[in-house]
Curated annotation (Swiss-Prot):
This is Peptidyl-prolyl cis-trans isomerase-like 2. The gene is cyp8. Pfam families: Pro_isomerase (PF00160). Pathway: Protein modification; protein ubiquitination. Belongs to the cyclophilin-type PPIase family. PPIL2 subfamily. Residues 490-507 have a biased composition (Basic and acidic residues). SMART domains: Ubox (SM00504). Residues 42-115 form the U-box domain. Residues 182-201, 227-259, 439-459, 479-530, 553-580 are annotated as: Disordered. It comes from Emericella nidulans (strain FGSC A4 / ATCC 38163 / CBS 112.46 / NRRL 194 / M139) (Aspergillus nidulans). Its EC number is 2.3.2.27, 5.2.1.8. Gene3D superfamilies: Cyclophilin-like, Zinc/RING finger domain, C3HC4 (zinc finger).
């Protein structure tokens, strides 16, 4: 017998479960909820550039086999200096020019077998020549035949010169959802391409529109004129925002984003929610306008990429000094935490409680046990893994943690490359002692005797003090204050010039006898209190907006007004003489 609570239909919770798989839920919805990448997989075709996502015309590739268009990747490298796909450093000299054969139909083919290179073809290129082949051709004619010469140019190559451009068995390398520049929302198109894409008439044949083409051209001219006037008005109305030297505390302030009012530099992308709360609760003070929340100076600066200046510090230990470079651009929270704790004197007389030769040295715990320490906020803060920083060299400075998002005050310095720690520990600095990275102090710390059971240095290695040479956050605030001060001075000078000009104009209206001459706006002022003042104001306002009219560009012949027909009257009233 069934239970009384059994439903004769599928409930909402069953549809929304992780195991849901049907036409209504959609294939792969369970994988999407669990974070599996297959649900959002989007494959980049072979003939497309990995940056502009458009068909390439001048193909080049990297050492890892990522294909770009030369006209798209060079401006990116000049601006960012990284590989837009994986975020690793990239130079223009690292690019390899590709030579891909085409058939009469314009399709890319193998130059030997004339096989068309599709999205499912295993495609490779030779590093020294740049010629592109199908993998079957290289395998049958070169590898199995032990003939290590380019089949087109007859140049020698080795197995290491073979670069895989596309492998149908490894389609993850062409997954758009994994591209770094797409994750960060950065476009690979040039400014000219963006303007062309945003142009609504880019696919319209203007020459075939006849007289309507003049209307489109006039509309474009009017839009351009409006944009120029808006820019001039915005530059004239913008005023600097006052800011104090001391950081604002966590209490949020608000700012209205009504039209015509400048938005503060630290305005958040979300509102305070007071309008919605007062609408749904009678206990709230009524608010009729949405107000943007203001971020504190700390929250404003700790956004990744906001402060790009490097920080510099020195750790003085009982075994010597270690000079550090702090990567504020990629790990602002970790750098802020380290600098604030150092200025607070938190690391003074703190021991390095763990030292493993060939691995790393760890410290920053005031208790000396490895289980203590807290951040400047008094709680754990999140990891910062976005960026090109890796544990790829000796002297890397990273945060120690107990798991995901458990960073506090402890840090460690690596003695070698530790790739297994990537995406597990936040990298926020590097040792810059000369000769880098094998500093004498770091070598001395690595060879320091330790307890083989606990890996604790014997005798203890203590941090005498941490000196901050360059605080990037203070420099950022100083530069911002100077720019605001200069903008304020410029606004004051403009206001003084305007006031002086108006005073001179007023003086010109008074004669040497003391009589005031009627100015050009006097008649308007006198008539402002007379009958019909609102009608005149409306007419003047309408005339001010007449400059955007475009009807004058319509090329049509005027039509003459039809002549009125003459009405033939039937005469006046009769005298009834015709009546019998």
């Amino acid at each position: 017998m069934g239970k009384g609570t059994d439903k004769l239909y599928i409930t909402h919770s069953e549809w929304a479960s992780e195991d849901a798989y049907s036409a209504s839920a959609g294939a792969g919805v369970g994988k999407a909820r669990r974070g599996v990448g297959e649900a959002s997989f989007k494959r980049l075709p072979f003939r497309f550039c990995s940056l502009s996502l458009q068909p390439f015309e001048h193909p080049v590739c990297t050492q890892s086999g990522t294909i770009f268009d030369l006209t798209s990747i060079l401006p990116w490298i000049k601006k960012h200096g990284t590989n837009p796909v994986d975020g690793t450093p990239l130079k223009g000299s690292d690019l390899i020019k590709l030579t891909i054969a085409k058939n009469d139909a314009g399709e890319y083919i193998d130059p030997v077998t004339y096989k068309v290179l599709t999205d499912n073809t295993h495609v490779v290129a030779l590093r020294n020549t740049g010629n592109v082949f199908a993998w079957d051709t290289i395998e049958r004619l070169n590898i199995k035949g032990k003939m290590w010469r380019d089949l087109v140019s007859d140049e020698e190559f080795t197995r290491k010169d073979i670069i895989t451009l596309q492998d149908p068995q490894n389609i993850e390398s062409r997954d758009l959802s994994r591209f770094n520049h797409i994750k960060e929302g950065e476009s690979g198109l040039s400014d000219e391409q963006l303007r062309e894409r945003e142009d609504p008439s880019r696919n319209v044949n203007v020459n075939a529109l006849g007289s309507s083409a003049k209307i489109l051209k006039a509309r474009e001219a009017v839009a351009k004129a409006r944009q120029e006037r808006a820019q001039k008005a915005g530059n004239a109305a913008s005023t600097p925002v006052a800011k104090t030297d001391a950081p604002v505390k966590s209490a949020q302030k608000t700012a209205s984003y009504q039209s015509g009012k400048p938005v503060p530099y630290n305005a958040a992308r979300y509102t305070t929610g007071l309008a919605a709360a007062s609408f749904t609760s009678t206990g709230m003070t009524p608010h009729t306008s949405a107000e943007l929340a203001l971020l504190s100076d700390e929250d404003y600066m700790l956004k990744r990429g906001r402060v790009k200046q490097k920080g510099y510090a020195r750790i003085s230990t009982t075994s010597g000094d270690i000079n550090l470079e702090l990567h504020t651009e990629y790990a602002p929270k970790a750098v802020w935490n380290f600098i604030k704790l150092a200025k607070k004197g938190y690391y003074k007389d703190v021991t390095f409680h763990r030292n493993i030769k060939g691995f790393m040295i760890q410290g920053g715990d005031p208790t000396g046990t490895g289980r203590g320490g807290e951040s400047i906020w008094g709680k754990y803060f999140n990891d910062e893994f976005e960026g090109p920083l890796k544990h790829d060299s000796r002297g890397t400075l990273s945060m120690a943690n107990k798991g995901k998002n458990t960073n506090s005050s402890q840090f460690f310095i690596a003695y070698r490359a530790l790739p297994h720690l990537n995406l597990k520990h936040t990298i926020f600095g590097h040792v810059i002692d000369d000769p880098t990275p094998s500093s004498p102090t770091l070598n001395k710390l690595e060879t320091h005797p330790v307890n083989p059971t606990t890996n604790r240095p014997t005798p203890d290695i203590r941090i005498v003090d941490v000196t901050i040479f360059v605080d990037p956050f203070e420099e950022f605030l100083k530069q911002k204050k100077q720019s605001e001060q200069s903008a304020e001075n410029e606004a004051n000078r403009t206001a003084e010039n305007d006031e002086e000009g108006s005073r001179r104009a007023e003086d010109d209206q008074i004669t040497w006898t003391g009589k005031r001459v009627r100015g050009p706006g006097a008649s308007k002022e006198e008539s402002s209190t007379t009958v019909g003042k609102y009608l005149k104001a409306a007419l003047s306002e309408r005339a001010a907006h007449d400059e955007d009219e475009i009807v004058e560009f319509v090329d049509e012949e005027p039509t003459s007004e039809p002549a009125k027909k003459k009405f033939k009257g039937i005469g006046g009233f009769g005298d009834f003489s015709s009546w019998d």
